[in-house]
């Protein structure tokens, strides 16, 4: 008897280096262009960030793209184009959230997308304790939603707290 597990795509999870976090905080402090009209969700504030001289892209993101391509294949190869194109950072923004803010399931455009948690305003344990159903729902979670081999909707939850500071790189078309 053999067990067959079909291949599937995944995502990367990694902690940023202190100098990368410092660079992002500097970008956030300088941000002043409203991104909310182009985004979904009930969020306190969303601002576009400017990656000066592509520092964050060149130092951090391109490495994650390479690691992802090594493990799961270069997803950019699947996009029909007339020639080769360099990876670039199309848009970059910060969501400043407060207690009770939320972002509904959505997806992003492009080949790759990422999220970086820098300062989590809540703790999932506290949020779970205050839910009426107390069923460990989705309060203070970050979730991926996808279908399994049977077509059933499946989720993968990140339960967020102060310890969650880190980075995840994931495919743009996966629902979050």
Where are these regions (language model features)?
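Non-heme Fe(II)/2-oxoglutarate
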Residues: 1-86, 91-103, 138
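Catalytic core of non-heme Fe(II) oxygenases with the double-stranded beta-helix
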Residues: 90-170
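Conserved small/polar residues in nucleotide/adenosyl-binding loops
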Residues: 175-176
């Amino acid at each position: 008897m053999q067990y067959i597990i079909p291949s599937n795509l995944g995502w990367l999870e990694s902690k940023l280096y202190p100098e990368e976090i410092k660079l992002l905080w500097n970008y956030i402090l300088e941000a002043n262009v409203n991104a909310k009209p182009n985004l979904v969700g009930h969020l306190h504030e969303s601002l576009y960030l400017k990656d000066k001289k592509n520092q964050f892209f060149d130092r951090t993101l391109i490495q994650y793209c390479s690691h992802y391509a090594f493990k799961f294949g270069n997803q950019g190869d699947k996009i029909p184009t007339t020639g080769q194109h360099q990876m670039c950072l199309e848009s970059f923004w910060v969501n400043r959230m407060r207690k009770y803010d939320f972002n509904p399931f959505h997806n992003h455009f492009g080949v790759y997308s990422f999220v970086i948690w820098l300062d989590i305003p809540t703790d999932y344990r506290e949020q779970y304790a205050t839910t009426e159903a107390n069923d460990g729902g989705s309060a203070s979670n970050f979730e991926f939603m996808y279908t399994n081999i049977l077509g059933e909707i499946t989720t993968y939850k990140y339960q967020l707290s102060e310890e969650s500071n880190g980075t995840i790189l994931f495919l743009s078309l996966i629902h979050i």
